[in-house]
Amino acid sequence: MKNLEHVCYNTRFSHIYVERRIRNHPRTEQILLRFPQAQIVEIEHYKDVFNRHGQDCVRQHQAQALILAEKTDHFFYEGAPVCQDFGNTNFYYCSTMMNCIYDCSYCYLKGMYPSGHMVLFVNIEDYLEELDHILKTQNMYVCISYDADLLAMEAVTGYVRLWSAYAAKHENLKLEIRTKCAGHAMWDLPCLSNVIYAFTLSPQKMIAVSYTHLTLPTNP
Protein backbone atom coordinates (compact mmCIF):
# COMPACT_ATOMS: atom_id res chain seq x y z
CA MET A 1 0.00 0.00 0.00
CA LYS A 2 2.84 2.38 0.81
CA ASN A 3 4.41 1.80 -2.60
CA LEU A 4 1.08 2.34 -4.34
CA GLU A 5 0.51 5.53 -2.40
CA HIS A 6 3.97 6.80 -3.29
CA VAL A 7 3.63 6.40 -7.05
CA CYS A 8 0.19 8.01 -7.08
CA TYR A 9 1.58 11.40 -6.07
CA ASN A 10 2.04 14.03 -8.75
CA THR A 11 5.49 15.50 -9.20
CA ARG A 12 6.28 18.83 -7.57
CA PHE A 13 4.79 21.81 -9.44
CA SER A 14 2.84 19.58 -11.82
CA HIS A 15 0.02 22.04 -11.11
CA ILE A 16 0.57 25.79 -11.09
CA TYR A 17 -2.16 28.16 -9.94
CA VAL A 18 -1.95 31.69 -11.34
CA GLU A 19 -3.87 34.77 -10.28
CA ARG A 20 -5.60 36.19 -13.35
CA ARG A 21 -4.33 39.72 -12.74
CA ILE A 22 -0.69 38.61 -13.08
CA ARG A 23 -1.19 35.98 -15.79
CA ASN A 24 0.63 38.17 -18.33
CA HIS A 25 3.26 39.49 -15.94
CA PRO A 26 6.74 38.98 -17.50
CA ARG A 27 7.97 37.01 -14.49
CA THR A 28 4.90 34.78 -14.59
CA GLU A 29 5.64 33.98 -18.20
CA GLN A 30 9.29 33.25 -17.44
CA ILE A 31 8.40 30.87 -14.62
CA LEU A 32 5.76 29.03 -16.62
CA LEU A 33 8.28 28.43 -19.39
CA ARG A 34 10.32 26.41 -16.91
CA PHE A 35 7.43 24.01 -16.40
CA PRO A 36 6.05 23.26 -19.88
CA GLN A 37 4.30 20.09 -18.69
CA ALA A 38 2.51 21.73 -15.77
CA GLN A 39 -1.24 22.11 -15.71
CA ILE A 40 -2.03 25.83 -15.40
CA VAL A 41 -5.10 26.78 -13.37
CA GLU A 42 -6.20 30.43 -13.28
CA ILE A 43 -7.62 31.70 -9.99
CA GLU A 44 -8.90 35.02 -8.66
CA HIS A 45 -6.79 35.18 -5.50
CA TYR A 46 -4.09 32.96 -4.06
CA LYS A 47 -6.00 32.61 -0.79
CA ASP A 48 -8.79 30.81 -2.67
CA VAL A 49 -6.38 27.87 -2.85
CA PHE A 50 -3.86 28.50 -0.10
CA ASN A 51 -6.31 29.35 2.70
CA ARG A 52 -8.94 26.69 2.08
CA HIS A 53 -10.12 24.79 5.16
CA GLY A 54 -9.42 21.13 5.72
CA GLN A 55 -6.19 20.83 3.74
CA ASP A 56 -3.72 18.01 4.43
CA CYS A 57 -0.39 19.83 4.51
CA VAL A 58 1.65 16.65 4.90
CA ARG A 59 0.21 14.99 1.81
CA GLN A 60 0.25 18.21 -0.18
CA HIS A 61 3.97 18.51 0.43
CA GLN A 62 4.44 15.17 -1.34
CA ALA A 63 2.98 16.74 -4.50
CA GLN A 64 3.53 20.43 -3.92
CA ALA A 65 1.76 22.86 -6.23
CA LEU A 66 3.04 26.34 -7.04
CA ILE A 67 0.80 29.39 -6.68
CA LEU A 68 1.85 32.57 -8.51
CA ALA A 69 0.38 35.70 -6.99
CA GLU A 70 0.70 39.45 -6.47
CA LYS A 71 1.53 40.92 -3.07
CA THR A 72 -0.48 44.10 -2.56
CA ASP A 73 0.35 45.28 0.96
CA HIS A 74 2.48 44.64 4.06
CA PHE A 75 5.69 44.10 2.12
CA PHE A 76 7.82 44.24 5.28
CA TYR A 77 7.13 43.14 8.85
CA GLU A 78 8.94 44.14 12.01
CA GLY A 79 10.81 41.24 13.56
CA ALA A 80 9.48 40.08 16.93
CA PRO A 81 11.66 40.80 19.98
CA VAL A 82 12.18 37.05 20.54
CA CYS A 83 13.67 36.63 17.06
CA GLN A 84 17.40 36.78 16.45
CA ASP A 85 18.46 40.20 15.21
CA PHE A 86 22.17 39.65 16.00
CA GLY A 87 22.42 43.09 17.56
CA ASN A 88 21.12 44.94 14.52
CA THR A 89 18.60 47.76 14.76
CA ASN A 90 15.46 48.02 12.62
CA PHE A 91 15.11 44.27 12.12
CA TYR A 92 12.50 43.34 9.52
CA TYR A 93 11.56 40.35 7.44
CA CYS A 94 9.65 39.94 4.21
CA SER A 95 8.00 37.08 2.37
CA THR A 96 8.37 37.01 -1.39
CA MET A 97 7.62 33.30 -1.02
CA MET A 98 5.55 31.34 1.48
CA ASN A 99 6.38 27.72 2.30
CA CYS A 100 9.45 25.72 1.44
CA ILE A 101 10.48 22.89 -0.87
CA TYR A 102 12.18 21.19 2.07
CA ASP A 103 10.18 19.21 4.61
CA CYS A 104 11.97 19.53 7.95
CA SER A 105 9.95 17.84 10.67
CA TYR A 106 10.58 20.60 13.23
CA CYS A 107 9.79 23.56 10.97
CA TYR A 108 7.33 26.11 12.34
CA LEU A 109 5.83 26.58 8.86
CA LYS A 110 3.92 23.31 9.32
CA GLY A 111 1.82 24.99 11.97
CA MET A 112 1.82 28.47 10.49
CA TYR A 113 0.19 27.94 7.10
CA PRO A 114 -3.04 26.07 6.28
CA SER A 115 -1.55 24.62 3.09
CA GLY A 116 1.49 22.61 2.04
CA HIS A 117 1.61 24.34 -1.35
CA MET A 118 4.03 27.15 -2.16
CA VAL A 119 3.11 30.77 -2.92
CA LEU A 120 5.46 32.93 -4.97
CA PHE A 121 4.80 36.64 -5.31
CA VAL A 122 5.99 37.74 -8.75
CA ASN A 123 6.02 41.50 -8.10
CA ILE A 124 9.34 41.79 -6.26
CA GLU A 125 9.83 45.26 -7.77
CA ASP A 126 7.03 46.53 -5.51
CA TYR A 127 8.98 45.30 -2.49
CA LEU A 128 12.05 47.18 -3.65
CA GLU A 129 10.05 50.34 -4.30
CA GLU A 130 8.69 50.24 -0.76
CA LEU A 131 12.21 49.66 0.52
CA ASP A 132 13.40 52.75 -1.36
CA HIS A 133 11.08 54.90 0.75
CA ILE A 134 12.02 53.29 4.08
CA LEU A 135 15.77 53.51 3.50
CA LYS A 136 15.52 57.27 3.03
CA THR A 137 14.86 57.64 6.76
CA GLN A 138 16.58 54.68 8.43
CA ASN A 139 18.89 51.75 8.01
CA MET A 140 17.40 48.24 7.89
CA TYR A 141 18.36 44.66 8.65
CA VAL A 142 16.05 42.47 6.54
CA CYS A 143 15.71 38.71 6.57
CA ILE A 144 14.46 37.93 3.06
CA SER A 145 14.36 34.14 3.39
CA TYR A 146 12.30 33.90 6.56
CA ASP A 147 9.25 31.88 5.50
CA ALA A 148 10.90 29.98 2.65
CA ASP A 149 14.30 29.05 1.22
CA LEU A 150 14.91 31.59 -1.53
CA LEU A 151 18.25 30.15 -2.55
CA ALA A 152 16.69 26.73 -3.12
CA MET A 153 14.31 28.34 -5.63
CA GLU A 154 16.87 30.62 -7.27
CA ALA A 155 16.84 28.73 -10.57
CA VAL A 156 13.11 29.45 -10.81
CA THR A 157 12.92 33.00 -9.46
CA GLY A 158 16.32 34.69 -9.68
CA TYR A 159 15.34 36.62 -6.54
CA VAL A 160 18.61 36.23 -4.64
CA ARG A 161 20.46 37.81 -7.55
CA LEU A 162 17.97 40.70 -7.63
CA TRP A 163 18.23 41.27 -3.88
CA SER A 164 22.02 41.16 -4.04
CA ALA A 165 22.11 43.73 -6.83
CA TYR A 166 19.83 46.00 -4.82
CA ALA A 167 21.93 45.66 -1.66
CA ALA A 168 25.05 46.59 -3.62
CA LYS A 169 23.52 50.04 -4.19
CA HIS A 170 22.29 50.63 -0.63
CA GLU A 171 24.93 50.66 2.11
CA ASN A 172 22.36 51.26 4.85
CA LEU A 173 20.65 47.95 4.05
CA LYS A 174 21.82 44.61 5.40
CA LEU A 175 20.27 41.39 4.09
CA GLU A 176 20.18 37.97 5.71
CA ILE A 177 19.49 34.94 3.51
CA ARG A 178 18.81 31.73 5.42
CA THR A 179 19.20 28.49 3.50
CA LYS A 180 19.74 24.74 3.60
CA CYS A 181 20.41 24.67 -0.13
CA ALA A 182 23.51 23.07 -1.61
CA GLY A 183 23.12 24.79 -4.97
CA HIS A 184 25.79 26.94 -6.57
CA ALA A 185 23.59 29.90 -7.51
CA MET A 186 25.34 32.26 -5.10
CA TRP A 187 28.91 31.52 -6.11
CA ASP A 188 28.95 33.86 -9.10
CA LEU A 189 27.40 36.74 -7.14
CA PRO A 190 29.63 39.52 -5.81
CA CYS A 191 30.79 39.13 -2.21
CA LEU A 192 29.07 41.95 -0.33
CA SER A 193 29.63 42.91 3.29
CA ASN A 194 25.93 43.70 3.69
CA VAL A 195 24.60 40.37 2.37
CA ILE A 196 24.83 37.54 4.90
CA TYR A 197 24.23 33.92 3.92
CA ALA A 198 23.17 31.86 6.94
CA PHE A 199 23.61 28.15 6.22
CA THR A 200 22.17 25.20 8.11
CA LEU A 201 24.39 22.15 7.61
CA SER A 202 22.92 18.81 8.68
CA PRO A 203 24.83 15.51 9.08
CA GLN A 204 23.57 12.41 7.31
CA LYS A 205 22.12 11.01 10.54
CA MET A 206 19.77 13.96 10.82
CA ILE A 207 18.49 13.44 7.29
CA ALA A 208 18.26 9.66 7.65
CA VAL A 209 15.69 10.01 10.43
CA SER A 210 13.81 12.62 8.36
CA TYR A 211 14.37 15.61 10.62
CA THR A 212 15.51 17.61 7.60
CA HIS A 213 13.77 15.74 4.82
CA LEU A 214 14.81 16.56 1.22
CA THR A 215 17.90 18.54 2.23
CA LEU A 216 21.39 17.42 1.26
CA PRO A 217 23.93 16.04 3.75
CA THR A 218 27.25 17.67 4.52
CA ASN A 219 29.06 14.44 3.60
CA PRO A 220 28.60 12.40 0.37
Name each model feature, range by range.
Residues 94-104:
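Cysteine-centered iron-sulfur cluster-binding motifs in ferredoxin-type domains/subunits
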Residues 212-218:
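Conserved small/polar residues in nucleotide/adenosyl-binding loops
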Residues 148, 205-211:
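Surface-exposed cleft-lining segments at the edges of enzyme active sites
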Residues 1-90:
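Flexible, acidic/Gly-rich N-terminal and inter-domain linker regions that tether
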Residues 23, 99, 151:
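Glycine-/small-residue-rich active-site loops that bind phosphorylated ligands and cofactors
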Residues 200-204:
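Short connector loops/turns at beta-strand edges and beta->alpha or beta->beta junctions
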Residues 60, 67-86, 105-198:
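Conserved Radical SAM active-site core
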